[in-house]
Amino acid sequence: MKKDIDVKCYELTLTPNYVSDWTFNDALRELIQNGTDQEVLDKENKFQIIYNGKEKTLRLVNQKSVLKINTLLLGRSSKANNEDTVGQFGEGYKIAALVLNRLGKTFTIYNNEKGEIWESRFKNSEKWLEKILAFYVYKHDTDNSGLCIEVGNVTHEEFNNLYKVWLHLENCDYSKAETGYGEIILDEEYAGEVYVNGLFVDCNSDLKYGYNFKPKYIRLERDRKTCDSWNVEEITSLMIAEAMVKGDIPIEQVRKMIEERADDVYHFEFNTY
């Protein structure tokens, strides 16, 4: 940051030990979720992840997004009450920035539509007499468009492990049956895995297939990393029934799942098809 430019400092009431159990993947999950949600809201606002192994930088880019300064307020979100997005609670990138700074990463936002750069780091606050997270915002001329979040000091191993978070990393391909509720993932290696809009979530159900649900059908807990098993099994029953009717899953396979009392079809007896 140049010393002769006008810089505004925005202090957040977040101390370094907040969400102390969060990992690198937890933080990136928040950022990926924000990026994919933006694409859901506007199909032209494409989201992509770019990793530069030489520079050890990870860039999360949306082609049309722009950040307003009031999004630094906790609870402030443009996605609240939108049933097609995963995020609902408005904490997102601020918490990710805190965790990544704590882990020794850099976290910089290139808010290109406003010609701004937002740099984050911890500072000793004179107001709060405590170390807190702050964003330093200054003007920057650029021909680039959209929004780019750049995370520095990211190792190859950390990048490669993001497949545990996001189903669509690095052109990941898989066999699937499309339904109105989302995708049934047919590949055996995904058995039991649950995703919502491509993002992995924990689920206690013992499932025969993997599933990638549309957000509006699955209720997530506040941490957005866990879901309600009853809700999941209710929707998987509907998905299996639809796929069976379409011929994407053989009726013999469905009958076997029912006989084995698989959680995928647990709610068959409660639903009418």
Residue ranges and their predicted role:
Residues 1-45, 103-108, 112-273:
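N-terminal assembly/transducer modules of large multi-domain enzymes
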Residues 44-55:
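Short beta-strand/loop element within the Bergerat-fold HATPase_c
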Residues 56-58, 147:
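Short beta-strand element(s) in the Bergerat
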Residues 59-119:
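Flexible ATP-lid and adjacent glycine-rich G1/G2 motifs of the Bergerat
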